[in-house]
Amino acid sequence: MKKILQFFIAIILCVNVIAQDPHYTQFNAVPLTVNPAYTGNFEEDIRVAGNFRQQWISSVAPISTTSIQADGKIGYENSSKQRPISLGVLFMNDNSMNGTFVSNYISAAASYQITLDKKENQKLSIGLLASYCNRRMDFSNISFQQQFATGGYDLSLPNGESALSNMKAYGCISTGLLYNFSNDKKTSVFDFGLSVFHINTPKQSFLKDDKQYLPMRFSVQSNYNRKLQDKFSAGINLLYQNQASVNYLLMGVSASSQFGQDEKNKIGLGFWYRTKDAMSPYLFIDYKKANIGLSYDITTSDLKNGAKPLKSFELSLQWRGFRKSK
């Protein structure tokens, strides 16, 4: 009975999953997932980042999502000229029901940045992301009627559900714009971005329906960080996303304090709120060129009324390096 229940939950889950992309609370930890124009959008030469999200841990249909990105500027540092071109790669794995439904995404990103003023305080970037997605369903741990034999279920027998594995890979194109502003002393930094994912609305196949299309995802992002008096800083983060009938606003605030003599060493606390879904306390540490963040989702939607409270957490890591002195 439990396996039958898992099967129907998997079907319902997959119908919802194919209509929308995975999402993160700490969206700014792996920024290529929300806007390809963030490629190379940092002071150092190279950035490597990762985010692991475990969602609905206490349910029969847990979801885990892992993303890894690497991006950097192209060419050699020149004090008289900025390097406008950046390249990056993004890998994402989305795993539902302990491997029953798995999606793998591999993407290549590129961006071009122009300076809008002589002081180089304002910049505009355009980004492009080309992605390839492969999905599969594995029902090796779930029994079907066709597998019933003398003495019980024999999982080595065909399950008769060939359509479940009939999922073709697809490719898609995404693009975005990003505006950056910083004051002369770099104590105030702001960005605002717009992006559209899956512009070509690729065709997907699920079960016997070959008319499933991945809808476009529209995203708006904004981040503001301000260095306050002495050793304190504060930040505000906003993300709005809309895909088909699913839309939400994610808002975050944070405050940090410097520790030690290096101004890059900080420890901070924050709070995220995703409309109609969850609120998340957030802890992060910056040490030299590395950053680590941990957030925990507290469900505020109707899902909180279940027999067991649904638990979700995220762990993010980021490292930047190889910045050459001018």
Predicted ranges, named:
Residues 2-10:
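Sec-dependent signal peptide recognition
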Residues 10-11, 284:
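Active-site/pore-lining binding-face segments in mid-to-C-terminal subdomains
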Residues 15-19:
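Sec/Tat signal peptide C-region and signal peptidase I cleavage site
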Residues 20-326:
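Subset of outer-membrane beta-barrel
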